[in-house]
Amino acid sequence: MKKKIICLFIILGSALNLPTFSHAATWYIRGSISGELSRSSDFFDRDSTATTPPALFGTTPGSDGRSIGAYGDFGRFLGLEGSVGAYVLPWLRMDLSHNYRPHMEYSGQANFAGVPGAQPVYATASSLSLMCNIFIEPMRLAGFSPGRLRPYLGGGLGLAYNRIDGMTYLFPGLKVHKISITPSGEKTNRAFMVTVGTLIALSQRVFLDVAYRYTDLGRVRTEAGRMYMNNLPAGIEISETRTRLGSHGIFLGLGYSF
């Protein structure tokens, strides 16, 4: 973490010797890469009282006294983003961004009652999102001339398409039932983000974009269907399970104004 902070200050400090932004630039394009950390994403039944098909977790307490579910998160992952936007006022810009998070590894623990020992859970997911964003530059709003640094605050709304492969539940403490694999699932839902960052001029047209961003990508779900079990190859029918997907991330982008 200290190394990342030092590198960020080096980037910001080096901007003192770089050109300022072009006053005439209105439109811009930007490509970014992000390093993100998932919030807790615990899977539960969509309806824990469902009977047709039955809920996977149900309503009884788990082995640790909590509601039965899969407790975990999607860990650390990378994202790619492409954006096109424009300044609608000297201090206000808007853009349309497309973000792809190609590989998110879910890892957690289940707590089914009566199962001894650990109950690891694994899955792989991905997400595509499209958002309309708005950014306010407070220094320009306050009447200061644009310099090499343009701090901003922003937010966006849009849609996210989230997909997850079948979730694998392992039961190493059981003698017969060792593994269950749920159906995969996909869902398109509303998404939003909030961000704070700064633009850094590399020339009158080229700029860096460094930002912190919180993103909520809505729900991830496994669909109702047949769950595989090693001791019952035909499996059993289960209802939908779901969680929310949110992340904290650092975004580094390179843009061009024209």
Residue ranges: model-predicted function:
Residues 1-26:
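Cleavable N-terminal export/targeting peptides
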Residues 21-26, 91, 139-150, 202-205:
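Short loop/turn motifs that connect adjacent beta-strands in outer-membrane beta-barrel proteins
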Residues 23-39, 151-153, 247:
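Transmembrane beta-strand segments of Gram-negative outer membrane beta-barrel proteins
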Residues 26-28, 244-258:
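Outer-membrane beta-barrel "beta-signal"
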Residues 31-37, 96-100, 153-159, 198, ...:
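Transmembrane beta-barrel strands of outer-membrane/channel proteins
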Residues 35, 86, 98, 136-138, ...:
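Residue-level signature of outer-membrane beta-barrel architecture
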Residues 38-75, 99-130, 159-189, 217-230, ...:
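Extracellular/periplasm-exposed beta-strand and loop segments of Gram-negative cell-envelope proteins
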Residues 78-82, 128-132, 151, 190-196, ...:
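Hydrophobic, lipid-facing positions within transmembrane beta-strands of outer-membrane proteins
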